[in-house]
């Protein structure tokens, strides 16, 4: 936490993106702070973004903008697949992704693999808007390393969602060749995976490497998509979808529209589903094309 010398009653949290760029938010209260066996965990209450989960001094999610991230990482792959029943979620200890996944009536089981149980405990206590479905009867919580899990499990999934932090520390292996090969192995023959893939402005080389590794793993369709994320570096973020069979641009929009009558969303709808791919910026499309040549 950084104290503002001019206004001593004001507390600010600052995340430094690099030596020249930072994001600061004014803090109402520090609700939770603990160092687990893996990372430093903080939950703060902010004036403009509500409660925020911070891991190792890095924003993970805030109440104000989390719906953008969690809806897009979940509903894009789950509606691209015509009948997703068995889903694996790796990471996302705040519970926001699981909350969105269980909204799908076709989903029967959600294996939720999280490395740090302390994150789940903190979010269940202080961020119930996100963690509200972790105890859903469809959800099977597994406390282990996601890298190890996909390497060892014999289970097969229709959709795998990798809700991972930045590629540093224990999470670095979630962006390496061997991990993608194991994810491919864990998917059914028509399976789909999606992964958090950083900022196209700051991390274009990383996105290209992800695309290469996914191609080498055997995926036929590889498509990054972008979206605004105010509390992430640059405010411009991405996911990368990889599919063995189904193309997200070929979904039945009427099916999505009908399903959404019984599903509350704030950002995602049938038009966003296709538009988010069609509106991909040229520099990103060019970079992906080059990576896949």
Curated annotation (Swiss-Prot):
Tell me the name of the encoding gene: speE
Instruction: Tell me the lineage of the source organism.
Output: Archaea, Methanobacteriati, Methanobacteriota, Methanomada group, Methanococci
The record's InterPro entries line, in alphabetical order, gives: PABS, PABS_CS, SAM-dependent_MTases_sf, Spermi_synthase, Spermidine_synt_N, Spermidine_synt_N_sf
GO BP, one annotated term:
spermidine biosynthetic process
Subcellular localization, per the record? Cytoplasm
Residues annotated for S-methyl-5'-thioadenosine binding in this entry:
39, 114, 145-146, 170
Gene Ontology cellular component terms for the protein in this record: cytoplasm
Q: Which SUPFAM superfamilies match?
A: S-adenosyl-L-methionine-dependent methyltransferases
PROSITE patterns recorded for this chain?
Answer: PABS_1, PABS_2
Q: What quaternary arrangement does the UniProt entry report?
A: Homodimer or homotetramer.
Per the UniProt entry, what species is this protein from, by scientific name?
Methanocaldococcus jannaschii (strain ATCC 43067 / DSM 2661 / JAL-1 / JCM 10045 / NBRC 100440)
What is the recorded function of this protein according to its Swiss-Prot or TrEMBL entry? Catalyzes the irreversible transfer of a propylamine group from the amino donor S-adenosylmethioninamine (decarboxy-AdoMet) to putrescine (1,4-diaminobutane) to yield spermidine.
Task: Tell me the pathway.
Answer: Amine and polyamine biosynthesis; spermidine biosynthesis; spermidine from putrescine: step 1/1
What UniProt keywords are attached to this protein's entry?
A: Cytoplasm, Polyamine biosynthesis, Spermidine biosynthesis, Transferase
Protein's UniProt name? Polyamine aminopropyltransferase
Residue positions binding spermidine: 70, 94, 163-166
């Amino acid at each position: 936490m950084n104290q503002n010398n001019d206004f001593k009653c004001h507390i600010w949290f600052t995340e430094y993106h690099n030596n020249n760029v930072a994001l600061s938010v004014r803090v109402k209260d520090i609700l939770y702070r603990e160092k687990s066996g893996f990372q430093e965990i903080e939950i703060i209450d902010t004036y403009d973004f509500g409660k925020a989960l911070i891991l190792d001094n890095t924003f993970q999610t805030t109440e104000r903008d989390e719906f953008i991230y969690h809806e897009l990482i979940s509903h894009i792959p789950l509606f691209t697949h015509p009948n997703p029943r068995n889903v694996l979620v790796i990471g996302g200890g705040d519970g926001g992704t699981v909350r969105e996944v269980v909204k799908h009536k076709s989903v029967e089981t959600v294996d939720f693999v999280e490395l740090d149980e302390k994150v789940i405990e903190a979010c269940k206590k202080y961020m119930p808007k996100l963690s509200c479905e972790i105890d859903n009867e469809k959800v099977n919580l597994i406390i282990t390393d996601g890298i190890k899990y996909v390497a060892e499990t014999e289970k097969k999934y229709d959709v795998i969602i990798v809700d991972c932090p930045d590629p540093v520390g224990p999470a670095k292996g979630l962006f390496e060749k061997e991990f993608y090969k194991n994810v491919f192995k864990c998917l059914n023959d028509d399976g789909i995976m999606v992964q958090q893939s950083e900022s196209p402005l700051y991390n274009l080389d990383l996105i290209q490497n992800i695309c290469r590794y996914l191609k080498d793993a055997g995926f036929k369709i590889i498509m990054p998509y972008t979206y605004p994320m105010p509390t992430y570096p640059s405010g411009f973020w991405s996911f990368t979808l990889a599919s063995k069979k189904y193309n997200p641009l070929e979904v039945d929009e009427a099916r999505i529209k009908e399903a959404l009558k019984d599903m509350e969303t704030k950002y995602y709808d049938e038009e966003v589903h296709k538009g988010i791919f069609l509106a991909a910026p040229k520099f990103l499309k060019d970079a992906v094309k080059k990576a896949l040549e």
